[in-house]
């Protein structure tokens, strides 16, 4: 145990470790706040669809040889979120079909562009890094950290300011519309915020693993709590804890950060399932 603490203290002296912890905590917090809403609205796969769009956008940025890819990826992903929401409201194209169409199309086009126009000598490594997250946390620059901090503050502020509206739209959209609430506008707001979170999370966990940050904390919290507020708070705490534990474990074991965080979240979900079963039996 002493050796582990000494090793962690040694790594803590390096800025890239602090950057990874800051970004990991912020992304985990933001994704968990919106995760409860997405799960309850059965929009869980919108995160998966938009993450594939972000991969395609990353490929376009690489083809255009743009150094700072995040602004372009952010714009394309947000526009796709709007398109996805509008297409899902089409009676001829259902929501799940729209997600599958945009998701698979973006992934295929992105990989095709990277194969045709890539000048990298390690294409498979670049693709793997984009899909599953960087194998090294050295890739986070101070600019990316500050951008993540700014966008995370914006996401949390939006969630707090529109908490009651999001709550109403999440539980009973029909009633919210009948009460005069602009439900479509708040659905759009949720989709845009999710798009922002996905772009921020790509460097840490990759485009294919982002959905885990959204789904697992929410499902784990729902096993133990019933009210929307309690579930949201529990999901946020669990998500941040799993992110911290996953990053520290990846440092000690030398494993990919994203995969390690998701593995910890799977373990937390298993424990919460058991806890929920025990608590449910006691209540009966």
Model feature map: region roles:
Residues 4-10, 103-160:
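Transmembrane helix-bundle core of multi-pass membrane transporters
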Residues 203-259:
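Transmembrane alpha-helical segments in multi-pass inner-membrane proteins
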Residues 1-29:
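Membrane-interfacial amphipathic/re-entrant helices at transmembrane-helix boundaries
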Residues 36-121, 221-233, 250-254, 277-278:
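Short loop segments and helix-boundary regions at transmembrane helix junctions
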Residues 140-217:
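Helix-loop-helix "hairpin" substructures at the membrane interface of multi-pass membrane proteins
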Residues 21-25, 70-75, 97-101, 145-150, ...:
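Hydrophobic alpha-helical transmembrane segments
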Residues 23-31, 57, 61, 72-84, ...:
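Alpha-helical transmembrane segments in multi-pass membrane proteins
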Residues 255-284:
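Cytosolic-side transmembrane-helix boundaries in multi-pass membrane proteins
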């Amino acid at each position: 145990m002493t050796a582990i603490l000494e090793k962690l203290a040694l790594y803590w002296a390096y800025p890239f470790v602090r950057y990874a912890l800051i970004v990991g905590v912020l992304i985990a917090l933001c994704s968990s706040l919106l995760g409860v809403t997405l799960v309850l609205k059965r929009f869980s796969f919108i995160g998966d669809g938009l993450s594939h769009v972000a991969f395609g956008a990353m490929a376009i940025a690489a083809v255009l040889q743009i150094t700072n890819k995040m602004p372009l990826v952010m714009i394309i992903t947000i526009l796709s979120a709007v398109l996805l929401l509008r297409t899902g409201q089409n009676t001829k194209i259902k929501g799940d079909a729209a997600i599958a169409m945009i998701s698979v199309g973006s992934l295929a086009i992105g990989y095709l562009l990277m194969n045709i126009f890539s000048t990298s000598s390690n294409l498979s490594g670049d693709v793997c890094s984009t899909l599953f997250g960087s194998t090294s946390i050295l890739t986070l620059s101070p600019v990316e950290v500050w951008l993540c901090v700014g966008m995370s503050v914006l996401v949390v502020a939006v969630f707090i300011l529109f908490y009651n509206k999001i709550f109403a739209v999440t539980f009973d959209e029909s009633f919210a519309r009948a009460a005069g609430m602009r439900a479509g506008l708040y659905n759009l707001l949720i989709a845009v915020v999710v798009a922002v979170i996905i772009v921020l999370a790509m460097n840490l966990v990759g485009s294919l693993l982002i959905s885990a940050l959204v789904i697992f904390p929410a499902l784990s919290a729902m096993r133990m709590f019933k009210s929307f507020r309690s579930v949201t708070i529990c999901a946020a705490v669990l998500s941040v804890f799993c992110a911290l534990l996953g990053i520290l474990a990846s440092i000690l074991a030398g494993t990919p950060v994203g995969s390690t965080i998701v593995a910890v979240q799977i373990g937390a979900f298993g424990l919460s399932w058991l806890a929920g079963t025990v608590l449910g039996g006691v209540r009966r």
